[in-house]
Amino acid sequence: MSGTLEVVRPGPLTTVQDLGRPGHAHLGVPRSGAVDRDSLKLANRLVGNEEGAAALEATLSGPALRFEEATVVAVTGVVAPVSVDGEDLEVNAAIDVPAGAVLDVGTAAAGLRPYVAVRGGIASEPVLGSRSRDTLSALGPEPLAKGDRLAIGEPAGPRPAVAVAPVAPPGSDAVVRVTPGPRADWFGPDALKLLAGEAWTVSPESNRSGTRLDGTPLPRLRQDELRSEGMVEGAIQVRHSGLPMVLLADHPTTGGYPVIAVVVAEDLPKIAQARPGQEVRFRDA
């Protein structure tokens, strides 16, 4: 262990996340892990961690953290105010934090989920091979609370020479590529045209299990019920209401709603960072 951090302000649903625990779907346990894996990997690279090291994922507004020992951190995924002891700093950059200083990540102006990586990684106890919090199965460390103290691991390698990553900020709308789902025929031969023809709006009821979308309900050709079948991250289920939901990291491993399409894996970060009220459009890949 190379130090400890204290939670001064947890921020909304701030959890420890890494790249998840794949391979346990047969036990009913989803992969979990960071919803926006690209941002997690970038934050870890900036501080010299392995890409899959455990970091912190928040929702809309980030945490305030006091570090007992000097360290290096990076904040990615969003455009947000970041400061150390009141000094304004940048996102997508390596930040030196002196011993005893407080890192403060404010409310995001763009994007939804900030990621905070610490050199050495968060050294919480692994569960089924991962340090991630699974909000569906309640596995892994609890979401952060004021006064919590988290152990920081030993650095895995030298600090990178590149300290800044020129990353485009999250857009105000998201165009997401999809492929046909296994139950697209439940919506007729033009299922993807129906899906792509609507400007969907992200619902405030969205969470780490899935992004719910509001808009014009999709008509179903079949009204009978579907037996539960295996689900994957990025699957677009159509609920009884006719409204779609994109499954995310903490999704149930089975489900009975028909899957009209599946989001291309490379575009999942766009869904992960889409804020309530933001517009999402789908495009046939």
Task: Give the ranges of each region predicted by the language model.
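Conserved "landmark" site that anchors the functional core of diverse proteins
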Residues: 1-285
